[in-house]
């Protein structure tokens, strides 16, 4: 279960995910030098809007994709605060795939099929050259997002190009204890729309 994991924050202190029981969570593998880095702005807007209602964002920077999260934890946190006003929790830099994969991510990847929009297939085709040898459930790029309900269930996985604004409607439903429905498009056998 999600709440069984203990992770390191940006200051290398242990944080039990059980601290987030009863909250709606968005877990993301961020990066400071990626084309999707401006999503930090949208993420912060979601946080500002919904944090008072029990919403949290957990950012786990990863340098695995073209080394787009260079620098120390302190530098990454400083960059995000300075450029995007990030106030949500940022954790220690991790690997999301492979031999040194963070156990939390090993778990997350088994819990939900990825929601993709129409541009995702084209994006993944372009990224193939940079990510050879990935397993079917592996994270494909920075800013893959996992949405977690108040009970700790991973209810959705969103591709990197799915924006925070596209996820907002699902956050609202989970905060109201409504179920969300992710519609799988028949043209996408490897994902949902």
Across the structure, where does each feature detected by a protein language model lie?
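Extracytoplasmic/secreted proteins, especially bacterial periplasmic and envelope-associated proteins
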Residues: 42-45, 75, 99, 103, ...
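Conserved helix-turn-beta segment immediately C-terminal to the redox Cys motif
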Residues: 23-25, 32-61, 80-84
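N-terminal "domain-start" segment that seeds a small globular fold
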Residues: 1-18, 36-38, 115
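Thiol/selenol-based redox catalytic cores and closely related redox-interacting motifs
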Residues: 79-81, 85-161
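A cross-taxon signal for low-complexity, glycine/charged-rich
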Residues: 190-193
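Non-catalytic, surface beta->alpha helical segment in thiol-disulfide oxidoreductase systems
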Residues: 155-179
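Thiol-based oxidoreductase modules, predominantly thioredoxin-like and allied folds used
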Residues: 53-71, 87-98
